[in-house]
Amino acid sequence: DTTESRGLGDVYKRQMYDAPGIGLAAIQVGVPKRIIVMDISKEEGKKEPRYFVNPVIKNKDSIKSTYEEGCLSVPNQFAEIDRPSKCEVEYLDYHGKKQLLKADGLLATCIQHEMDHLEGVLFIDYLSKLKKSMIIKKLSKLKSNTAVL
């Protein structure tokens, strides 16, 4: 339902901006829906949110690009990740209209990163076992050092 997806998208958009982050998948906030919001605009004060409902990647480039990625689900941890430099994604937009977007650069990376969440994959899953275990240890240590009052 477009109205429900739009309302949920607006909530996720606020959560993404509050975090702050450039993308958020519904599943990251415990909602098992295939909805993604993102905003990679760099201009201060100019927001350009994008909504992707039921996104499907139709094509990925064989050429890779590397970006340092972080994630609201893996706080304060960052790593360089190789992903296809371009992708085509089909989705329903904010108004429920079917769209096909050819993305490259940071937008392509962000789409793939957020779509990974829909499949239960985190950016740290692309790392070597050693790097991934180091990040998990850091997160566990942070969690155990955080007192709940």
Residue locations for each model-derived region?
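Active-site rim/adjacent substrate-binding subdomains
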Residues: R6-Q112, H117-L149
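Ala/Thr-enriched low-complexity intrinsically disordered regions
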Residues: T2-T3
